[in-house]
């Protein structure tokens, strides 16, 4: 197997893992919300209140997205917020495919 083929397989595997992490309606809603609030990100509380979900559910989904490298935690003053790791346009393009 040549280097380009190996690289391609790795890239496709990474893309599949990322899409797998996004493959839930609540996670897509979280990503859409984070797209609109990219500057300072959003707290877990803000996310669960806006989406009318339970806090443990949002925390679990954010953890899955964080482990996939899609979102990251940032500290804003005393609070921990979540924001997108990927470029806003990339996420918006992906989310638009589903909405």
Where are these regions (language model features)?
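A short acidic, leucine-rich amphipathic alpha-helix
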Residues: 46-48
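Beta-hairpin "wing" of winged helix-turn-helix
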Residues: 67-76, 83
């Amino acid at each position: 197997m040549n280097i380009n083929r190996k690289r391609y397989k790795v890239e496709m595997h990474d893309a599949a893992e990322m899409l797998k992490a996004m493959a839930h309606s609540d996670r897509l809603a979280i990503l859409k919300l984070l797209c609109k609030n990219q500057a300072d990100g959003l707290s877990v509380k803000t996310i669960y209140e806006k989406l009318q979900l339970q806090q443990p559910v949002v925390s679990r989904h954010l953890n899955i997205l964080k482990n996939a490298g899609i979102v990251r935690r940032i500290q804003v003053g005393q609070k921990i917020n979540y924001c997108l790791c990927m470029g806003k346009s990339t996420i918006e393009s992906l989310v638009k495919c589903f909405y």
